Amino acid sequence: MEYYNVGKIVNTHGVRGEVRVLATTDFIDERFAKGNTLYLQQSGEPLPLTIESTRQHKGFVLVKFVGYDNINDVEQFRDHELMVSADDQQPLDDGQYYYHQIIGLDVETTDGRHLGKIKEILSPGANDVWVVERPEKRDLLLPVIDEVVKNVDLDKNFVTVELMEGLE
């Protein structure tokens, strides 16, 4: 089964078994809802954890898991990734994609010139930015806006872009 990151446990919170999670998902309310199962990345098979309660606190998501009732139970989870199974992913609207679908795609210009591969996605604010790794050149930062991204073809594993002046 495939798993995808939705957050990282960065610390414990209090003494009653809560953990502080830095969420990396756009679906915080859905992913961290009471009763949902998340999987803890560890060596070997991921550990399934059922959410008992969730609350927001100072930019983090505080999560309590069923059966983990004190700080000693959850201390071992610190610095581990929380994941969701591929079966539990939310359906997206047309034109929306999960990061794992975009990373690794080839990037071509509208005139057919190959630029490189998307290696990372940044989320600095108003729109995402795709980091394109180019052979023997510095990475190219592409804003994910309609004026730049013209087509995403997941079946053929490539993206067509129109470079605005100053991007390259």
UniProtKB/Swiss-Prot annotation:
Molecular function via GO = ribosome binding
* Gene3D superfamilies xref list: PRC-barrel domain, RimM
Please name the GO terms of the biological process aspect recorded for this protein, alphabetically.
ribosomal small subunit biogenesis; rRNA processing
Q: Where is the PRC barrel domain?
A: 94-167
Q: Which UniProt keywords apply?
A: Chaperone, Cytoplasm, Ribosome biogenesis, rRNA processing
Task: Report the principal subcellular site.
Answer: cytoplasm
Against InterPro entries, the record matches this protein to:
PRC-brl_dom (IPR027275), PRC_barrel-like_sf (IPR011033), RimM (IPR011961), RimM_N (IPR002676), RimM_N_sf (IPR036976), Transl_B-barrel_sf (IPR009000)
Q: Cytoplasm as a keyword?
A: yes
Tell where it localizes: Cytoplasm
The record describes its quaternary structure and partners as: Binds ribosomal protein uS19.
Q: Which NCBIfam families match?
A: 16S_RimM
Concerning PANTHER family, the annotation shows: RIBOSOME MATURATION FACTOR RIMM
Q: Which family does it belong to?
A: Belongs to the RimM family.
Protein name in the entry: Ribosome maturation factor RimM
Task: Give the source species.
Answer: Limosilactobacillus reuteri (strain DSM 20016) (Lactobacillus reuteri)
